[in-house]
C-alpha cells in the first residue's frame, strides 16, 4: 500500500526561556529584538509558567490525526510536523518525507482561516522545499467552514455561556490574531473568512449578542486590524454588559496569545471594568477537533484525485 504524506504545519514556540531570543529574531526575519522587547516577551512567558505548551500540543495533534486517518484502513497516512519558526522546520519535514519515499502529500496549516500573510507563507516554504525532488504537494488553503470544526467551536461557546449567570445577556466576542491592516487593500480573504465562521457558529446557537474583534497585534509602526479585544471590553462595559465570552476562533491550541493575552491581560482588564470574562476552551487534541482535521485531509485527498 502506498503511503500518503501529510505535512502538518504550525507556528512553533521556544522550548525554554533560553530560546526566546532566537525565536523572536526568527519571527523578525533576522533582526534581533532590543533588550526591552526581549525582556517583555520573557516576562510574558514567565507569567504562563516559563514555556508555552504549544509544541507538546501540536505533537499530540499530529499523532492523533494520524491515528484517526489510519483507522479508516483505505489509505496509509504518515503525518510529518513542520514548524515555521522553530525546529523541526517545514523544510526539514519535507526532507524527511523525501527520505522516506513519500511521493505525494497533503499540506495543512493548523490555522483554519487563510491569509497570504499567514497560511500563504507556510505554503511558500513547503513548495520551495519540495521544488527539487518532491514530494508533490496538495496545499489546503482554508478549512474554516469544515462542519465538524464549526460544531467544535459551537460546543465550546455553548459550554462557556453555561458558566455565565445570564447567558442570554452575555456578549460573545469572536477573536483572531490581528494582521497588518494593509491586507484589506490586497483583497485578502482573512477578515471575510473569520466573519463567515463566526456567523456560522452564531447561527447554530441562535446568538443574539455577538461581535468580532482582534488580538495580539504586532508591535510595529504600521496600523493593524482593529478593534482590539481590550478596546472592545471597554466599549461593552460602557454599554452596560456584565459578562463576555471570548472565543479565539483563529487559534486551535493553548499558547502565549491565549494563556497570556486572554487569560491574564484581557481578564485583568475585564475585572477592572467590572466584567466577567469567560474564555472558550481551546481545541488542543480533543477528539472532536482531531476528527475535524482528519475530515479536512480526507476531503483534500479526494479533491487532489489521490
Put a short name on every predicted segment.
Residues 1-306:
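Active-site-proximal alpha-helix that buttresses catalytic centers in soluble enzyme cores
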Amino acid at each position: 500500500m502506498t503511503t500518503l504524506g501529510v505535512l502538518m504545519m504550525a507556528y512553533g514556540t521556544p522550548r525554554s526561556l533560553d530560546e526566546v531570543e532566537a525565536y523572536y529574531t526568527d519571527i523578525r526575519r533576522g533582526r534581533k529584538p532590543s533588550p526591552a522587547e526581549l525582556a517583555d516577551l520573557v516576562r510574558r512567558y514567565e507569567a504562563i509558567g516559563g514555556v508555552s505548551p504549544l509544541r507538546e500540543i501540536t505533537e499530540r495533534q499530529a499523532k492523533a490525526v494520524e491515528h484517526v486517518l489510519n483507522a479508516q484502513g483505505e489509505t496509509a497516512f504518515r503525518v510529518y510536523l513542520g514548524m515555521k519558526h522553530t525546529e523541526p522546520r517545514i523544510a526539514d519535514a519535507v526532507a524527511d518525507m523525501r527520505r522516506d519515499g513519500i511521493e505525494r502529500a497533503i499540506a495543512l496549516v493548523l490555522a483554519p482561516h487563510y491569509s497570504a500573510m499567514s497560511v500563504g507563507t507556510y505554503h511558500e516554504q513547503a513548495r520551495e522545499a519540495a521544488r527539487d525532488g518532491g514530494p508533490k504537494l496538495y496545499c489546503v488553503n482554508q478549512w474554516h467552514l469544515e462542519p465538524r470544526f464549526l460544531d467544535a467551536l459551537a460546543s465550546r461557546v455553548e459550554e462557556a455561556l453555561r458558566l455565565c449567570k445570564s447567558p442570554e445577556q452575555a456578549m460573545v466576542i469572536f477573536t483572531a490574531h490581528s494582521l497588518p491592516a494593509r491586507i484589506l487593500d490586497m483583497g485578502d480573504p482573512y477578515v471575510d473568512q473569520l466573519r463567515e465562521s463566526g456567523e456560522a457558529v452564531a447561527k447554530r446557537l441562535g446568538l443574539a449578542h455577538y461581535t468580532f474583534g482582534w488580538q495580539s497585534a504586532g508591535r510595529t509602526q504600521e496600523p493593524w486590524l482593529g478593534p482590539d479585544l481590550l478596546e472592545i471590553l471597554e466599549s461593552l462595559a460602557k454599554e452596560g454588559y456584565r459578562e463576555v465570552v471570548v472565543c479565539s476562533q483563529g487559534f486551535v491550541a493553548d499558547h502565549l496569545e491565549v494563556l497570556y493575552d486572554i487569560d491574564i491581560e484581557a481578564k485583568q482588564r475585564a475585572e477592572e471594568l467590572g466584567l466577567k470574562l469567560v474564555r472558550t476552551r481551546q481545541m488542543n487534541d480533543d477528539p472532536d477537533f482531531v476528527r475535524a482535521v482528519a475530515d479536512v485531509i480526507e476531503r483534500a485527498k479526494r479533491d487532489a484525485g489521490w
